Each structure stands twice: as C-alpha cells, then as structure tokens.
Amino acid sequence: DDSLTDKQLAWAFPVDRGAVLNIRDIEQGVENLNSVGQNKATVALNPGQDQGGTLVMLNNQLSRRWRGSVGINNNGVASTGEYQLDSNLVVDNLFGVNDSAFVSVSTNIGPHDLPHAMSRSYALSWSLPTGYWQWSLQNSFYEYEQTVLGDVVNFSMHGSSFNSSIQLGNTLYRSQTGKLDLSVGFIRKDSKNYIEDVFLETSSRVLYVWYLTTSYQHFLEQGTISINAHLYKSVPWLDSKRQLVSAEDDFQFTKYQFNIGYNTYFQIADQAVQYAMMADFLYSPKVILASEALTVGGRYSVRGLSQGGLFGYKGGYIRNDISIPLQTDWPWPGQVQLFAGIDAGLSNLPEYPQKRSEWVAGSVLGFKLYDRNFSISFSYARALRVPDFLQQKQQEIDFSVRFNF
C-alpha cells in the first residue's frame, strides 16, 4: 500500500531477502517500524509459492508524520514562578529511515515572589533503530535569571546548563516472552553560574560521563516487568577538572543505579483496574555532586513532599499507583481516569553527619479527563511521614491542562 518504503524496510529488518526465516528477526523489524509514532504495523506469515518458502505480509496503518502538544501546569515554585508553559513537537521519519526527532520548549509564566525571575529550557533529540541496533542523540539547554533579595541591597544571578549525550544500544537477546538490551553512552554536562556578571568558578563545572546500561523486559500475559542496571563513571577529560580549588574534594564520581518496574491490569466486578510499581535505587561509594545524587521527595519520587526531600548518595524509593479508566457517554470528556498512589523512600544524610539515614512516605489522589486532543489532570498529594528536620510544605495540589495537535 506504499505506506512503507523499501528503504524503511531495509533499515528496520535485520534480514535479507531469501534468507532463512527467524521469527525473532521479524518481531524486531516490526518493533523498529512501530517505534515511529506514525506507523502501526502488523505482520502475517503466509505460505510462499516455493516449497518451504514463507511470504511475510506487512500491514501498516499510516498516520500523520508529525504531532505536538501545548500545556500549562503549576509545577514551578513560588519564588521564580509557579506556572509553567511548555510545548513539544515530534517529527517521524525525518530522513526516511524510521527515525524520530523531538523538540520541546518550556518557560515560567505569571507572577513570582522575586522582583525578577525567568527560566527557560529547550530540548532536542533524535533516535534511529536499525536492525538490532539503536542510536540516539540528546541535547538540553536551561537558562535562568533572577533578582535575589539581600539584607542591604538586591543582587542579580543568572546562569545556564547545557547537556549533550550520544547512546548506542543493541538487543542481545529476544524471545517470545522477553528481550535483553545493552547500551553504552557518553554525556557532556556544562554548567555556568554568575552573580552580578561575576563568574562563579566553584559552582560552575564541566563533566564528562560514560555510562553502561543493561535492560531486561519480560512480557507477562497481563503486564510487563522491566529491570535496568546502570553504571555511571565520570572522567577528567579536556576542559573538565578534578577539583576547582585545593580545599575541594575530587568531584569525579562513580555511581550505580538500579530500576525495576512492574505493571499489570485486572478486573474487579467487571471494572478494569491498572496497577504499576516502580522502584529506583542509587549507590555511590563516596559523596558526589548534588546534581548527580539522589533526592527522595517530590513530584518524581515520593509525592507529597513539596519542593524538596532527603538528599544523599545511598538510597532509593518505591512508587505504587492504581488507576481506574472509565468510559463516559458525555460529549466531553470521552474518558476519565481515577488514580491513587503511595510512595516511600530512604536515603543516607551527608548533610546531617549525626544522622545515618532517614525515610519518608507520601500519597497522591487525583483524576484525569481526556480525549484525543485535550486533557485536564488534577491531583492532591500529602506527606505521610517526614523527619522533623525537614522544614517544608507537606502537601501539594497539582494541575495541568494540555492540548494535542
């Protein structure tokens, strides 16, 4: 039906015409095609004209090659602006080889407590699957400006961070019930900070980081299990430094990260229920930079601990979520999702030498209204356990509105 070109098929499938049929190769090729959002490919195996031959039939439902969204949320902080506006765009098959390009922009909007505050972020990425290999390039840039209130005089601060990475992955093994991937990557991280246009050498750094990731995904009858192990190792190359001043410790680091995820679905009294669990653990043999350490508490770890939490380099957290999708007969929304979650996390405390470790817990309750082009979500998160030394809000209300085009 001309929805797939010969070039796309050649890049997607790790097979040659006339070769011995391997069903795993076919599955890999279909997965590569469907990694592009505009494709929805399925495969059927039919008898070939020659004895012992097989005809591989592909059917593809082709949709628009680009899509995007615009949204607003209140995930910022009061000092620099609680409300955030963001937009993103995805372009599929940019070079005609099943590749995808992604670009996003976000900025703070609305009132803020500081006299002047601006923050913006930009991201650009590109990915390409070919046979059993996967390539990806990622770039992100963040900049900020703000006026800080002093006891005598106000002063201005500004800065930026620019991260670039390249990754190469390979599917080492796949079966009917699972697959094993190995990837290696390299990251450059560059941060610059200024006070009154004076460069802050002690808080500005260039880091080069190698990483190695092993991922296994197991397909269940009603769900999946994913396991990921990461090794990160910084190296003092080129314009990076081991230390900025003689009194500072060597900030080159090695850290290990382990993630496990599980999701499934079941029914209770004819009502579909979805359950998801995610655990993330980090270990480093010595103190590492705050930007590379673990934060246990916040929207993306233990919910309910607003704008902060435990900081360390040995610990982790577990998140549990249950969601109930509901179909409606209303003109809008076509679908409603109710969700609830409970989280817990533990970390060592290098900022509090008298304490070895502490733990926190939190919860969330909310709903999402959505259809194909528009969605609204609302959630209320509350801390269930917070150590006395953490002086911060123990609840938060989040909302977001998003339009897809």
Q: Where do the language-model regions lie?
A:
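Periplasmic polypeptide-binding modules associated with outer-membrane biogenesis and secretion
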Residues: D1-G76, S106-R120, M278-A279
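Transmembrane beta-barrel strands of outer-membrane/channel proteins
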Residues: L45, V70-N74, A101-T107, L137-E143, ...
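Residues that define the transmembrane beta-barrel architecture of outer-membrane proteins
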Residues: G52, G81-L85, M118-Y122, S160-S164, ...
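Repeated loop/turn-to-beta-strand initiation elements of outer-membrane beta-barrel proteins
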Residues: W66-G68, F95-A101, G131-L137, R174-L180, ...
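Predominantly transmembrane beta-strands of Gram-negative outer membrane beta-barrel pores used
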Residues: S69-N74, Y83-I109, R120-E143, Q167
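Outer-membrane beta-barrel "beta-signal"
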Residues: L89, F367-F374, K393-F405
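Transmembrane beta-barrel wall of Gram-negative outer-membrane proteins
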Residues: L114-Y216
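C-terminal outer-membrane beta-barrel translocator/porin domains of Gram-negative envelope proteins
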Residues: Y194-Q335, I342-A344, N348-P350, F389-Q391, ...
